[in-house]
Regions:
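Auxiliary, metal-adjacent structural segments of Zn-dependent hydrolase domains
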Residues: 393-455
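C-terminal motif of bacterial Sec signal peptides marking the signal peptidase cleavage site
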Residues: 15-16
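C-terminal, non-catalytic "cap/extension" segments appended to globular domains
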Residues: 22-292, 297, 319, 323-392, ...
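Sec-dependent signal peptide recognition
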Residues: 2-8
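Post-HExxH zinc-binding segment in Zn-dependent metallohydrolases
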Residues: 314, 488-492, 496-539, 550, ...
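Feature representing long, continuous alpha-helical segments
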Residues: 482, 508-516, 544-552, 575, ...
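Active-site recognition of the HExxH zinc-binding catalytic motif
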Residues: 459-490, 511-512
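Alpha-helix capping and helix-loop boundary segments enriched in small/acidic/polar residues
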Residues: 446-447, 463-475, 497-506, 537-541, ...
């Protein structure tokens, strides 16, 4: 999970929130009259008055009484309006430099203060969690409005809506796009205390998620058998899911282990799991009967209750406060989709539902049932048999990854070779590796973005005492994909405001490009898009779209029930998960009323992040289809870098520049239909 992009997206949403509680000063300035009278030197009817007036009007909308009088406002406009293209470009360069400095310093503070809680460097104390929840950017927006830098930015680089960017952007050059993205920096205003409260709630949820380990060696069947290694500890949901997926290979007790993990997941989402068994090796737990033993004696333990859902509710309450300051996008839903993803939630929902109800889903489900030789079960949403690695026993892969990567430094040393295996030139492979730091993670691992051209990207990965197991390696390769994109579209970009990609879904697509080539990076030969690879992406879309709908519908429910309790939210989420399951999954996988779709931990600490994954899968497939035309690994790497260097356009503009067509599920539906027809 690309946490830093989420944090920066949150910053953008916070910086684009305004007040309803303070009446704006009634100020304004007619530039047409000023041009006619000569009040502003260099301003005349031939200059870009419409764009300039737009900036003036947007400044006026955010000007408060404490910012000054009408006379002060007019003086401000006369002093700071860049009336010539040359002056405007110089100002843009200076603002860009300052923004990069601010972002870099804030990022470094966040990294260092968060080290004890996110890295595997000893047990963090309560004080560490307090420091990690500190938002070093919380006062940035306030400060920039107070010293008028925000107003200067708005005046000269006004904001354009998503619709305007998509309609006008086709005629913009790179500098105009960069100006437009500068216009996204300050659109409204929010108190620092509100943004800090959002950070604190999220940090608390992260702390809960990051230590939610299930001690697999202490899980019992009803007959008292143990199927997992004594020291196996799996983080929910990531490692539980990946262990379940690994059991599609020919390993002892594979089916029994899958059923047990599924039951554990059910107990977690229903909150029937005994609270004391989480991250605790002192108890043996039989998840099917929910009985617990300590030192061979059965004990009675209270369930977790509604703690899981309390974290969602806490974040909702902080977003409610944020809503009051955001009249343009007055809900977290609007800010997430229109503001961050740059697609409306209805647009995303329609895309997902169209996919979930396609004939191809049932046909591929039937294909999986034939391969498995049994009726499908709910956990078959994670069927892993379309990957070549699924026929290689995981213990063999784990033995290899542990030998190669006993620690984080070993993985880092091997990065240039991995990149060369993908076709990157030796010098570029070394450059990228030199700008990525690898660190041991406390949680599942993540990629932490470099936001300034004086710092590295950071790959946080989970490495056990015996070295990196295959699950950890696969996740690390995903995060490595994030890092390569992060370094490339920052260090090789033409304008700082265009650094990055359009949204989180796009960077997830870039990470998927690496993750599906994990064996190629390991040395198993070139991996290309074949029928199984297409089916694998298709089935991944099917799984994560349902999970995403549960997340989206949960937040719609919260806004419809703003006074909900944690227990009420728990019941609602379970109901939503079952309804989505019954409508889109039961016809394919069977089992009425399964709550499995509520298992993803993202719902707790990164609300509405999940839709980025299926959108990312859609983008990923379109990229794979495009990159398949490359005749060699070197051509693949060259084209990939060209796509990276487009930077942060809107999603549709970026996609058209990447592959020549907008974001669409049609290519993969057509490809899957062709595969089914030919089998």
């Amino acid at each position: 999970m690309k946490r830093i992009l989420v944090c920066l997206s949150l910053l953008a949403m916070i910086m684009s929130c305004s007040t309803r509680q303070q009446t704006p000063a009634r100020v304004g300035y007619d530039l047409s009259s000023a041009a006619a009278s000569g009040d502003i030197p260099g301003l005349n009817q031939k200059t870009d008055l419409d764009r300039m007036q737009r900036g003036v009007d947007q400044c006026a909308a955010l000007w408060r009484p404490e910012d000054g009088t009408q006379a002060d406002f007019e003086a401000f406009v006369k002093r700071w309006l860049a009336t010539s293209p040359a002056d405007r470009e110089v100002l843009f360069g200076k603002l860009s430099r300052a923004m990069e400095i601010f972002a870099t310093q804030a990022n470094q503070l966040t990294i260092e203060l968060g080290r004890p809680t996110v890295l595997a460097e000893g047990e963090p104390g309560d004080i560490d969690y307090l420091f990690s929840s500190h938002d070093s950017y919380a006062h940035f927006s306030d400060d920039m409005f107070e010293n008028k830098v925000a107003f200067i930015t708005i005046l000269n680089f006004p904001h354009y809506t998503l619709e305007e960017k998509n309609s006008l952007g086709g005629g913009w050059d790179r500098l105009q796009w960069a100006y437009a993205r500068m216009g996204d920096r300050f659109t409204e205003r929010v108190p620092a205390s509100v943004s800090q409260a959002v950070t604190v709630a999220r940090s608390a949820a992260e702390g809960y998620v990051d230590v939610y380990n299930i001690k697999m060696g202490h899980l019992l069947t009803e007959e008292g058998e143990k199927f997992f290694p004594e020291d196996m500890s799996l983080l929910s949901h990531w490692n539980l899911r990946d262990e379940l997926k690994s059991d599609y290979a020919d390993v002892p007790h594979a089916r029994e282990k899958q059923e047990m993990i599924y039951k554990v997941m059910e107990r977690i989402v229903t909150q029937e799991i005994p609270a004391a068994v989480v991250n605790n090796p002192e108890y043996d737990w039989a998840p099917f009967s929910n009985r617990v033993w300590k030192d061979g004696k059965e004990v009675s333990l209270p369930s977790e209750g509604d703690v899981r859902y309390g974290h969602i509710l806490n974040q909702f309450h902080t977003f409610q406060e944020l809503d009051r300051w955001c009249p343009a996008m007055p809900t977290a839903i609007a800010r997430n989709f229109e503001g961050s993803i740059e697609m409306t939630d209805k647009e995303v929902e329609d895309l997902f539902v169209r996919f979930l109800t396609s004939d191809q889903v049932k046909k591929v489900g039937g294909m999986i049932g034939q391969r498995l030789g049994r009726e499908l079960r709910p956990y078959d949403i994670w069927y892993d048999g379309f990957k070549s690695r699924s026929v290689i026993p995981e213990d063999k892969l784990t033995a290899e990854t542990r030998k190669r990567y006993p620690d984080a430094e070993a993985f880092h040393r091997d990065m240039p070779r991995q990149l060369r295996n993908l076709g990157f030139a030796a010098d570029e492979a070394q450059f990228l590796a030199d700008h990525i730091v690898v660190e041991g993670a406390r949680g599942s691992g993540h990629a932490w973005e470099c936001v300034g051209r004086t710092e590295p990207a950071r790959l946080r990965t989970r490495i056990g005492e015996g070295g990196m197991d295959y699950k950890g390696y696969n996740i690390a390769v995903h995060e490595f994909g994030h890092n390569v994109e992060q370094v490339t579209d920052l260090y090789h970009i033409d304008h700082y405001t265009l650094a990055g990609v359009p949204n989180t879904a796009t960077t997830e697509a870039m990470a998927f490009l690496f993750q599906v080539r994990d064996l190629q990076l390991l040395g198993y030969g070139r991996q290309t898009m074949d029928a199984d690879a297409t089916l694998d992406i298709f089935w991944n879309m099917y799984e994560i779209m349902g999970v995403s709908l549960v997340d989206m519908y949960t937040w719609r429910w919260l806004y419809a029930h703003p006074d909900a309790t944690a227990s009420g939210l728990r019941d609602a989420v379970l109901s939503i998960a079952r309804e989505v399951w019954n409508k889109y999954y039961e016809p394919v996988l069977g089992t009425h009323d399964s709550p499995l779709l509520a298992i993803y931990s993202h719902m707790l600490d990164y609300p509405m992040y999940l839709p980025n994954y299926p959108i990312g899968h859609i983008i990923h497939y379109q990229l794979e289809e495009h990159l398949a035309k490359c005749g060699s690994d070197a051509a693949f790497a060259t084209e990939l870098q060209r796509i990276y260097r487009q930077g942060r356009l809107t999603p549709q503009a970026w996609m058209k520049g990447a592959v020549g067509s907008p974001i669409s599920i049609d290519p993969i539906l057509a490809a899957v239909e062709k595969i089914i027809y030919n089998r």
